[in-house]
């Protein structure tokens, strides 16, 4: 059902989102870099030796302290079909001794036990609704593209914000006489449009994120053509523009996300031929580090939107050499330190534009030209709970 400025959202068809995991050589490199144990009998190898290997659908193992009073555990990413030891327990609990792990089904695992196929890696994505971009101020025209989006929680409500623009041939020829942008904000709790703003000075608005610490929305402006805005635009949560951020090393900002006090931006430097780079910024939008990630994008793929959680950055990539989106879209996954973790395939038949992660909920929006479709999914993961016995 199309959601307009007056109609409510409605759950409709289901769509399957498949993830095809690709890991570094022997899956040792990533885990070693995160402090995880190397495979038994093998030494840890340098990151420079990494070569992506296709094993099938990947899944995440999450470790829950289950009452622990100390210690921190990293997530693991494993492809189906690969046997690999669980990370050494680093949780502690006062007055108790660690007795292994258990999953929600009651299966029990020893410390460092070699496991395989704890999850099939496949997640189902359901289509929530189609949200209208409305009309340009000049209603004789139509929006030609919906781009970046973000789903966020505020004051007990869940919202969707997304951008729209008239990027027609005149726009690409440098004629802005009728070019128009829009940002729309829908309340997913009620299905109602609650705010919209037209003609903010951004180019495309490729990607968006929300910072819950200050309540602001950020737009990666895009910079598709010389002279067009190419940095980061900052808005209040209700779409009032308040600032714009530029960076000497960042010529074109394609994607942005925020998680746990850090922003992550996919972009390129100011010079032609600069590599696709993952930039990490602190909470004050100051550059902390950057990582050349171009070699991890399949040939011909371009950056779309991104999302992040406690451990990983998830980057949508699309191949625009043809529009068979079901075959030409990927999610490239990196650690927060820029190390390659894997590549998943998207089984969505429309152009996937942006991605948001809220806890276990994953949201993906697509470009429907005059609207955007919102899908909801869950990352393929299994949670292992620490088991404790009273200390003797």
PLM regions and their residue ranges:
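A short beta-strand motif characteristic of beta-propeller blades
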Residues: 126-141, 192-198, 240-247, 287-297, ...
């Amino acid at each position: 059902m199309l959601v307009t400025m007056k109609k409510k959202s409605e759950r409709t068809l289901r769509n399957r989102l498949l993830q095809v995991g690709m890991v570094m050589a022997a899956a040792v490199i990533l885990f070693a870099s995160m402090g995880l144990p190397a495979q038994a009998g093998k030494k840890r190898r340098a990151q420079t030796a990494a070569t992506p290997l296709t094993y099938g659908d990947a899944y995440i193992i999450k470790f829950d302290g289950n009452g622990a009073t100390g210690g921190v555990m990293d997530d693991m990413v494993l492809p189906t079909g690969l046997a690999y030891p669980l990370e050494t327990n680093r949780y502690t609990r006062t007055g108790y001794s660690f007795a292994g792990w258990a999953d929600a089904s009651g299966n029990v695992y020893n410390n460092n036990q070699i496991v395989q196929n704890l999850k099939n890696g496949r997640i189902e994505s359901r289509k929530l609704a189609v949200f209208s971009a409305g009309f340009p101020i000049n209603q004789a025209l139509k929006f030609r593209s919906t781009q970046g989006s973000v789903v966020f929680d505020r004051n007990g409500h869940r919202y969707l914000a997304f951008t729209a623009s008239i990027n027609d041939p005149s726009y690409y020829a440098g004629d802005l006489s009728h070019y128009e942008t829009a940002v729309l904000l829908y309340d997913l709790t009620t299905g109602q449009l609650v705010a919209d703003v037209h003609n903010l000075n951004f180019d495309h608005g490729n990607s968006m994120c929300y910072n819950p610490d200050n309540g602001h929305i950020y737009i990666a402006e895009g910079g598709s053509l010389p002279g067009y805005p190419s940095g980061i635009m900052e808005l209040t949560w209700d779409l009032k523009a308040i600032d714009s951020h530029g960076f000497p090393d960042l010529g074109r900002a394609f994607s942005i996300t925020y998680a746990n006090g850090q922003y992550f931006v996919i972009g390129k430097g100011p010079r032609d031929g600069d590599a696709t780079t993952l930039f990490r910024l602190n909470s004050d939008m100051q550059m902390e580090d950057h990582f050349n990630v171009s070699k991890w994008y399949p040939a011909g793929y371009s950056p779309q939107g991104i999302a992040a959680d406690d451990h990983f950055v998830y980057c949508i990539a699309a191949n625009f050499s043809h529009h068979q989106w079901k075959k030409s879209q990927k999610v490239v996954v990196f650690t927060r330190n820029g190390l390659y973790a894997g590549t998943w395939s998207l089984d969505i038949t429309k152009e996937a534009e942006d991605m948001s992660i809220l806890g276990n909920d994953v949201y993906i929006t697509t470009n429907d030209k005059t609207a955007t479709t919102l899908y909801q999914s869950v990352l393929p993961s299994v949670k292992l709970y620490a088991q404790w016995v009273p200390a003797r």
